[in-house]
Amino acid sequence: METVASTQVQTLIVRRFGLVSYEPVWRAMQDFTQQRDAETTDEVWLLQHEPVFTQGQAGDAEHVLFPGDIPVVQVDRGGQVTYHGPGQLMVYLLLDLRRLKMGARDLVTMIENTLVDTLAGYGIEAHARKDAPGVYVGDAKIASLGLRIRRGSSFHGLALNVDMDLEPFLRINPCGYQGLRMTQIKEFVPDVSWASVADAWLSQFVRAAGFQSVVEQRGLPGDE
């Protein structure tokens, strides 16, 4: 007989948003994680953000060089400062790691592998680095990771540069690394579409995490 727990681990809810501001989504992630219990179905949120710099818990103000007209938001994820903006694939991973039988390091490795495999599908040879989380093409960073684990559940996630204005990265030391060069899929695949990359990554993730079914829902949790 199938139990509630086994049903939850087999199903993933996916929510897709348009271009949205950062703080309402961040607060919704916090609320979802605080309220979830052992029977809460895992979720993945796919979206783009209006321009914003986010400063992680380990963030040092000296890495924010000249933000100009782009707001800087102090947040509760790991890592240093990064930039989010239109044309970047944001993925928020709201997962019960205990149910998935994963530790934080396992999750990071899985995310990096799904990104490398997604990029390979576009003919881009990418790799992870042991000394600096994220995914790189040569010495240029194409995807960033920043997670928080609370009561065995993850939130925040990853940012993959697809087709965006990279100039704002020059206003910071990305992820705390002075002079770190950023790149994006468009530099290798000029006609790339954000939606196709989102679908390609999602397929890799569903397979890697072992979900058996995907349910698409609209709006933030509680808005249905």
Curated annotation (Swiss-Prot):
Listed PROSITE patterns: BPL_LPL_CATALYTIC (PS51733), LIPB (PS01313)
GO biological process: protein modification process
Taxonomic superkingdom: Bacteria
Location (main, coarse): cytoplasm
Residue ranges annotated for the BPL/LPL catalytic domain, each copy included: 38-213
Active site residues of this protein: C175
Residues that hold substrate according to the record: R77, G78, G79, Q80, V81, T82, Y83, H84, S144, L145, G146, G157, L158, A159
Reaction catalyzed: octanoyl-[ACP] + L-lysyl-[protein] = N(6)-octanoyl-L-lysyl-[protein] + holo-[ACP] + H(+)
Cellular component per GO, a single term: cytoplasm
Xref: InterPro entries: aa-tRNA-synth_II/BPL/LPL (IPR045864), BPL_LPL_catalytic (IPR004143), Octanoyltransferase (IPR000544), Octanoyltransferase_CS (IPR020605)
Record's miscellaneous remark: In the reaction, the free carboxyl group of octanoic acid is attached via an amide linkage to the epsilon-amino group of a specific lysine residue of lipoyl domains of lipoate-dependent enzymes.
Role this protein plays: Catalyzes the transfer of endogenously produced octanoic acid from octanoyl-acyl-carrier-protein onto the lipoyl domains of lipoate-dependent enzymes. Lipoyl-ACP can also act as a substrate although octanoyl-ACP is likely to be the physiological substrate.
Protein name as catalogued: Octanoyltransferase
